[in-house]
C-alpha cells in the first residue's frame, strides 16, 4: 500500500526509542519491582504491550506485502477504557515512558487505519465519477436503457419521500401544461415531448456527477491535509487526527479511536448494483422461464447427447488424434523408425521396376546381338544410369522397316520396353519425392500438432487469467489504459508546484496524487511479471514518499518507469 513503508518505519522507530529509553532508566530491577506493586502502572504496561503487539503485527503485514491490515480496535478500546480513571504513582519513572509509548504507537496505527480506509474508498468515488461520465457520453438509446434500469429505484425513492396526496402537485411542478402546450421543455414544439425521458435521465446523471464532484473535493482535500500535516506535526498528531475526523479540539484518545473505527466514506451516488443493472434481463428470463424450462426438460436427452458428442468426445479425440498421435510420430521420426516413414509408393517398387527393365533389355539385346558380345555387368550399370544407347540403335533400325517388324512383333516388344522405361522414370521421380517427404517428416509432424498446441495454449491462457484476474476474459487492455491514465495524471500533478501550496489547492493536489499513485501501483502490479513486482512496488513507494525524493527525483522515477516497464504496458 502507498505510504505503508512510512508507517512501518515510524512504528519501528517508536520501538527502538522505547527500548533505548528503558535501557537508560534507573536500575531495571527497581523498575520491575515498582511495576509489580503499582496496579495502575502494571495495567498501563499491559495496555502498552497490547498496542505494541498490534504495531508489530502491522509491521509484519506491511513487510509481508499484505495490502491492508485490519486493526483490532476492541482490544485497544478496552485497554484505554481501563486506564481512563486510574491514578498514577507520584514520581513513577515509567509514567511518561509508558504514556508516550502508548500515544506514539496509537497515533501511527490510527493514521495507518485512516490511510487504508481512504485508499480503499476514495478510488471507488473516482470509479463512480468515471462511470457516470461514460453514461453521459453514450448514445440516447443506452441512456434510455440506463433510465429503465434505475426506474424502480427512482420510483421507490419518490414514494418514500412523498405522500400519495402530494403526487399530483409534484407532477404539476415537474411538467406544466397550459393551453395544450408544454412549458419548460428545451424545444418549442409540443410533439417533441418524447424527449422528456432523455432530459430526465440527463438531469439525473448531471446531479449525481455534481454530488460526486463535491464529495470528492471535500474528501480528497481532507486526505491531502492528513498526508501533509501528520508527518510534520509529530508533537501534535492527535489534533491532526481529530481535525480530520471533525472532532472537537482536545478530544481524548478513546474518542479518536472510536471515531476512526466508525469512520467510512460511502459514495453519495454509487454505481447501480447488479440487480438494478440486470433486472430487465431477469424479468424477461422469468417471463419465458417456465416454457423454457419445460422445453429444456423435454430435450434433455438431445442436449446430453450434444454435450457428449461436442464436448467430451471432442476433447478426447483432440487429445488422441491431434496431440498423442502426432507426438508419437515425431518421436518415431527422431528415432528413425522405418515403419513411420512417409511414402507415396510402397517400399521395393523402384527396385522391382528397375530389375524388370534390366531383364527385358538384356534378353532383347541377346536376341538381336551375338550373345558373346553382350557384357551383362556393364549393360546393367548403363541401364541403372539410364543409358539405353544399344537398345535405341536397334529400335531406330526397326523403324526403317516398321511393317515387317510389327508383324514379327519386335517393334511391339521395343515399344513395351520403352513403356517400362517410362514407368522406371516415373518411379524414380516418385522415389525422389518420397526422399523429400522423409527429410521433412519432422516438420510435417510439428505442423500437424500445431492446432492442438494452439487450443491448449488458449485454454492455459484462459486458466491463467481466471486465476490472476478472476475472469477468463482479458483485462489487460483495461489495466493498460488505467496505468496510462494514472501515469499521465501523476506526471501532470508532479509538474504542478505542490510544495508551494499549503492551502486547499496543495491538499487537493497531494491527495489526488497519492490516489493516482495507489491506482498506478495496483494496476501496474497486474501487468508487470511476478518476478518484477517487488521492483515495481519499490519504485512507486519511492515516488509516493514525501521525503525520500524531490519533485525532480520523482519525475526521474516516472522516466525510469517508462524505460524499464514500458514494454509491459
Curated annotation (Swiss-Prot):
Signal peptide: none
Main location: mitochondrion
GO biological process: aerobic respiration; mRNA metabolic process
Keyword field: Membrane, Mitochondrion, Transmembrane, Transmembrane helix
Membrane topology type: Multi-pass membrane protein
Subcellular location: Mitochondrion membrane
Transmembrane segment boundaries: 279-299, 442-462
Superkingdom in the source lineage: Eukaryota
Keyword Mitochondrion assigned: yes
InterPro entries membership: NCA2 (IPR013946)
Gene Ontology cellular-component terms listed: mitochondrial outer membrane
Protein task: Involved in the mitochondrial expression of subunits 6 and 8 of the F0-F1 ATP synthase.
PANTHER family: NUCLEAR CONTROL OF ATPASE PROTEIN 2
Official protein name in the record: Nuclear control of ATPase protein 2
Gene that encodes it: NCA2
Amino acid at each position: 500500500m502507498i505510504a505503508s513503508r512510512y508507517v512501518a518505519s515510524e512504528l519501528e522507530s517508536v520501538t527502538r526509542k522505547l527500548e533505548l529509553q528503558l535501557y537508560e532508566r534507573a536500575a531495571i530491577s527497581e523498575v520491575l519491582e515498582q511495576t509489580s506493586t503499582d496496579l495502575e502502572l502494571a495495567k498501563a504496561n499491559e495496555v502498552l504491550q497490547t498496542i505494541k503487539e498490534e504495531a508489530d503485527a502491522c509491521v509484519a503485514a506491511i513487510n509481508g506485502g499484505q495490502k491492508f491490515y485490519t486493526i483490532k480496535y476492541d482490544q485497544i478500546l478496552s485497554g484505554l477504557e481501563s486506564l481512563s480513571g486510574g491514578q498514577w504513582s507520584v514520581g513513577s519513572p515509567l509514567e511518561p515512558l509508558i504514556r508516550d509509548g502508548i500515544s506514539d504507537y496509537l497515533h501511527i496505527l490510527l493514521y495507518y487505519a485512516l490511510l487504508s480506509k481512504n485508499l480503499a474508498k476514495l478510488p471507488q468515488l473516482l470509479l463512480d465519477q468515471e462511470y457516470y461520465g461514460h453514461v453521459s457520453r453514450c448514445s440516447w438509446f443506452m441512456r434510455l436503457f440506463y433510465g429503465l434500469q434505475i426506474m424502480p429505484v427512482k420510483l421507490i425513492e419518490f414514494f418514500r419521500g412523498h405522500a400519495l396526496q402530494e403526487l399530483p402537485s409534484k407532477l404539476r411542478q415537474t411538467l406544466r401544461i397550459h393551453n395544450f402546450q408544454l412549458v419548460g421543455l428545451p424545444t418549442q414544439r409540443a410533439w417533441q415531448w418524447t424527449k422528456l425521458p432523455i432530459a430526465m435521465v440527463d438531469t439525473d446523471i448531471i446531479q449525481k456527477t455534481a454530488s460526486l464532484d463535491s464529495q470528492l473535493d471535500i474528501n480528497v482535500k481532507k486526505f491531502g491535509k492528513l498526508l501533509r500535516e501528520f508527518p510534520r506535526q509529530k508533537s501534535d498528531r492527535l489534533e491532526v487526527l481529530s481535525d480530520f475526523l471533525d472532532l472537537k479540539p482536545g478530544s481524548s484518545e478513546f474518542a479518536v479511536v472510536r471515531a476512526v473505527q466508525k469512520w467510512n466514506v460511502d459514495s453519495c451516488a454509487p454505481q447501480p448494483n447488479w440487480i438494478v443493472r440486470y433486472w430487465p434481463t431477469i424479468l424477461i428470463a422469468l417471463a419465458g422461464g417456465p416454457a423454457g424450462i419445460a422445453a429444456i426438460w423435454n430435450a434433455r436427452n438431445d442436449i446430453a447427447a450434444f454435450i457428449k458428442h461436442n464436448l467430451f468426445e471432442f476433447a478426447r479425440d483432440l487429445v488422441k488424434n491431434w496431440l498423442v498421435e502426432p507426438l508419437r510420430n515425431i518421436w518415431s521420426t527422431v528415432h528413425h523408425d522405418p515403419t513411420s516413414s512417409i511414402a507415396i509408393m510402397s517400399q521395393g517398387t523402384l527396385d522391382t521396376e528397375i530389375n524388370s527393365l534390366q531383364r527385358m533389355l538384356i534378353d532383347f539385346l541377346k536376341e538381336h546381338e551375338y550373345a558373346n558380345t553382350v557384357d551383362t555387368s556393364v549393360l546393367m550399370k548403363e541401364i541403372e544410369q539410364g543409358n539405353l544407347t544399344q537398345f535405341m540403335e536397334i529400335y531406330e533400325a526397326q523403324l526403317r522397316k516398321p511393317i515387317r517388324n510389327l508383324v514379327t512383333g519386335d517393334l511391339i516388344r521395343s515399344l513395351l520396353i520403352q513403356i517400362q522405361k517410362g514407368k522406371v522414370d516415373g518411379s524414380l521421380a516418385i522415389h525422389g519425392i518420397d526422399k523429400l517427404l522423409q527429410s521433412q517428416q519432422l516438420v510435417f509432424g510439428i505442423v500437424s500438432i500445431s492446432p492442438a498446441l494452439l487450443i491448449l495454449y488458449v485454454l492455459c491462457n484462459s486458466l491463467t487469467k481466471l486465476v490472476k484476474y478472476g475472469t477468463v476474459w482479458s483485462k489487460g487492455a483495461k489495466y493498460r489504459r488505467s496505468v496510462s491514465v494514472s501515469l499521465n495524471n501523476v506526471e501532470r500533478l508532479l509538474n504542478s508546484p505542490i510544495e508551494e501550496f499549503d492551502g486547499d489547492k496543495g491538499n487537493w493536489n497531494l491527495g489526488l496524487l497519492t490516489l493516482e499513485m495507489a491506482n498506478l501501483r495496483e494496476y501496474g502490479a497486474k501487468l508487470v511479471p511476478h518476478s518484477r513486482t517487488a521492483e515495481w512496488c519499490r519504485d512507486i513507494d519511492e515516488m509516493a514518499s514525501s521525503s525520500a525524493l524531490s519533485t525532480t527525483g520523482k519525475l526521474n522515477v516516472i522516466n525510469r518507469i517508462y524505460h524499464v516497464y514500458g514494454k509491459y504496458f
